[in-house]
Amino acid sequence: MPNLDVVKLVNKVVPLGSSSTSIYTCPANHTAVIKLLAFSNKDTSDRTFDLSFTASGGSAQQLLDAFNIAVATNIVYVFDDGKPFFMSAGDALSGVGSSASQVIALVAVEEYYDPNK
């Protein structure tokens, strides 16, 4: 059972490459709650991105394929406080952008220490 009294907050801004780019990996002995996962297009052209989830020890499963972000779109929300996403130790999220460094992933995570994991 995670220790719910001790939480570490992690925020990351990750430019997606044109090949698989790690967005977030849940550390050993932790349970994580993705409170926000959003994507932004900073280019002057429409862009797409893929989002994959890999369970610890498993193979990547694509969650979104060629998801479009139009030009001048501020942010596209995938997970937020009303729709969190739970991860276990070793689970990972990764993404691929249609053009290197033009699609930006923004992630906010609560990490809970779990000595039994």
Language-model regions, residue ranges each:
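Intrinsically disordered, low-complexity Pro/Gly/Ser/Thr-rich segments with frequent PxxP/GP/PP motifs
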Residues: 58-92
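A generic structural signal for short beta-strands and their flanking turns/coil linkers
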Residues: 33-35, 45-47, 89-91
